[in-house]
Amino acid sequence: MSRVRISLIYLCTFMIITSTKTIEYTACNNTIIIPCTIDNPTKYIRWKLDNHDILTYNKTSKTTILSKWHTSARLHSLSDSDVSLIIEYKDILPGTYTCEDNTGIKSTVKLVQRHTNWFNDYQTMLMFIFTGITLFLLFLEITYTSISVVFSTNLGILQVFGCVIAMIELCGAFLFYPSMFTLRHIIGLLMMTLPSIFLIITKVFSFWLLCKLSCAVHLIIYYQLAGYILTVLGLGLSLKECVDGTLLLSGLGTIMVSEHFSLLFLVCFPSTQRDYY
């Protein structure tokens, strides 16, 4: 009877289930290390996601069996104690991960996905500031042009065109905020940035109506076109999570500066051919 009791106690010492840990991951993580430490010598290590096997390592034959859904999975170390799992982001799924050995020792880790902002708060704030200032300067340019010339069809087209640009970019700003990486926010950012090309058309209309098309105006237009190219390139590089929006901000900032130059040129260099009311 005493032998049976000793055997049961011996078995119970190996049926240990460690406390569950929680680990958060984001799209910014290229790989995830799921920790697991087993101090007792074992014949094999098995990693599971819920009830599905991910990886089985046989220490005797030193062979590894992988799930076809987790081909990037591997053990962090082949030492006797450290059997942490390394897995790439493309194969990561949220859920409960369990590592166990042939003696029944288990370690459970709950993996939770945490959603992050598309851009950091500083870059998001600058995007709204640059866009807002650009639209305000556009409004001033159109207002100055409207009060400086007699109303005509071309002036009406300029006013309608400016209103359409402003509405599209404002709607885009509402869709983009807060800057999460979803389809809605991607559409919002596209609406905030791509209509900037039409600012060049409004600029040409304003200078043409005020008879100010000169070499300096061409330089301003080329400068703004360069800003738009930077914006498009930055936008193309930003169509994924956890990216640096510096190039996109450079383009939006260049467009904003060109709008400043345009307004200064309109106000400070009056045309002798203007027709007032």
From Swiss-Prot:
One of its GO terms (molecular function) is thrombospondin receptor activity. It comes from the Viruses. It holds the Pfam family V-set_CD47. It is a multi-pass membrane protein. The chain crosses the membrane at residues 124-144, 156-176, 186-206, 219-239, 247-267. The keyword Amino-acid biosynthesis does not apply. One of its GO terms (cellular component) is host cell membrane. Glycans are attached at residues 29, 58. Keywords: Glycoprotein, Host membrane, Membrane, Transmembrane, Transmembrane helix. GO terms for biological process: positive regulation of cell-cell adhesion; positive regulation of inflammatory response; positive regulation of phagocytosis. It is found in: Host membrane. Belongs to the orthopoxvirus OPG166 protein family. Promotes, when overexpressed, the influx of extracellular Ca(2+), leading to membrane permeability and host cell necrosis. This is Protein OPG166. It comes from Vaccinia virus (strain Western Reserve).
